[in-house]
Swiss-Prot record:
The lineage of its organism: Eukaryota, Fungi, Dikarya, Ascomycota, Taphrinomycotina. A zinc finger (TFIIS-type) spans 76-116. Zn(2+) 2 binds at residues 80, 83, 108, 111. This is DNA-directed RNA polymerase I subunit RPA12. A zinc finger (C4-type) spans 10-30.
């Protein structure tokens, strides 16, 4: 018998054994027999981290931010380098230190081409 966490496997064939209240546990695959008392005092300790359970609320918050940024985008007369459209939408973010300029993100409404520049 081999145990990995709360799962118990047959030592002969590796089949997963079913837990039972009977005196003996029998492997359904190879018919090996194990005394059930071996499994009675099995202690399982689990550990997890916050990253193992992603927050649905946090994910929703990120999606809302992206959508709100799209709504706040302004339009400028700038030629798209990809399709030649005369207008592009843009928004700015302060990604670098406060004493440096902001980053301008452009997006073409026609072909969805995106690029950014540092001011």
């Amino acid at each position: 018998m081999s145990a990995i966490g709360s799962l118990i496997f047959c030592s002969e064939c590796g089949n997963l054994l079913e837990s039972t209240t009977a005196q003996w546990t029998t492997c359904d695959q190879c018919q090996s027999v194990y005394p059930s008392e071996q499994f009675a005092n099995l202690v399982v300790e689990t550990k997890s981290s916050a990253s193992a359970f992603p927050s649905a609320l946090k994910l929703k918050h990120s999606i809302v931010q992206v959508e709100s940024q799209k709504e706040e985008a302004a339009t400028i007369e700038e030629k798209c380098p990809k399709c030649g459209n005369d207008h592009m939408t843009f928004h700015t973010l302060q990604l670098r230190s406060a004493d440096e300029g902001s980053t301008v993100f452009y997006e073409c409404p026609r072909c969805a081409y995106k690029f950014s520049t540092n001011n």
